[in-house]
């Protein structure tokens, strides 16, 4: 016989309007549940506990069938005792049945994290059709993946539930010239939060125990009406996209560096209020060490629609991959963080037939800097302990207005320069480049451009300039008359000879004749080895090509540096590559070259033996 205690199931709503208790008579149990759908919803609700305490009054409705076929309806209020109930004997089936019911009700709560003390308290207010919408309160949300689109939070995930990190966000907007009520989002856990309103996308805290705050203040102008303040405070460090501050893709790697940004703009001829972004953590910036003292100070002024825009100041920017296009310094990277390097950039431009003022770029770091306006491409400092300074001053001619180019560079020690596919190796020599350039722009002759002082210890590609070169240590010739046909290579001595030829700058310019003394700068073994390695790679590619045009292969073999023994090794290597790809015609031609090298070596040996005999 079933006991009443084992089969009491309660249906609880917010006002306890109805509940259910089975009625037992003559060992026949037939029950009717009031509002069964509500019962199922409450069973799946996380607010319902596994074993609720029964109330004092339960409104029961039941139908009882007796053996004689009669049906009676009981609709009464039963007093249920809350104290100790009498113990009754239970059968094995009843015990199994009751235990399985309890396991099912408790199974969905067994995996719940009880130690996590993270709470989501979300309060949101909106205005719909000029009427205040009632409060939408989402409280005590558990710390797992939930979609809270109403609060502007998508794909939230708690990484560390024991970290005490709080996001306090206050947002105000103007819609249809009506003030929208405050939308307050507070006490968000540290996780990936998508705050499109705050211009923060894909935030991820790297270190949850770091105390870093983002204090953001923003004001905008919309339809000539001042927008109310949008205050975003105490935001955790992470991937933050602050396009207004010109700092994209930020990631906190050093918790001690702050970005102080002040910006002003003019929209439709009206000055916009101050857009102030302060105490922002460093972003996707290449900072591998903490001991670096590097500062970027940028100053910029522009003219828009005939009105002078307010000063846009970007100060105290940490070192790294920063795109300062207004200052003409993209893709900057500091390789040595123990060097004290400062970027002071000042730029002013005026358009629409107004003379531009001096554009001055001073004390630029020795890094991978692309100064296209200064005529320098791909400069790289190899020795980071060397103190290097770049002083650049430039003016240009546009629309028949005179702009003077004036550029200066101060560098030290050794030069290895590539000019018109020509490599120069100068060991232990100090070389000075004095460069003078004149160009015709719109019928006006700009003043002389001058590049002075010593050259750096790196490869510099300055193909746009015609550079007269003055070198020390018996290495002096004029590059103004240099062209590709003037480089005469001597295979026997591994030297280049520079001759005298006519050189014309362009089709319309008169030919320029320059005299230069013939010098033979030797190529070092390291440089020769590098050239041969490049030739080897090119030979492999040429052999793999389709077709029977092998002219390029023999040109590369003639450009090899070194003795005949080295050339023989490269010819044998090329033959092996041709055998791999079954190039029969190429193999036959290379075998002829190999025979010529062998005969040449044999003749040199014979001459050497004759000299020895004569000496004896």
UniProtKB/Swiss-Prot annotation:
Q: Where is the composition biased (Basic residues)?
A: 86-106
User: From which residue to which does any coiled coil extend?
Assistant: none
Instruction: Quote the biased-composition stretches of kind Polar residues, using this chain's numbering.
Output: 69-85
Q: List the disulfide bonds.
A: none
Q: Where is this region: Disordered?
A: 69-110
Give the GO cellular component terms, alphabetically. integrator complex
A Gene Ontology biological process in which this protein takes part is: snRNA 3'-end processing
Q: Report what the protein is called.
A: Putative SAGE1-like protein
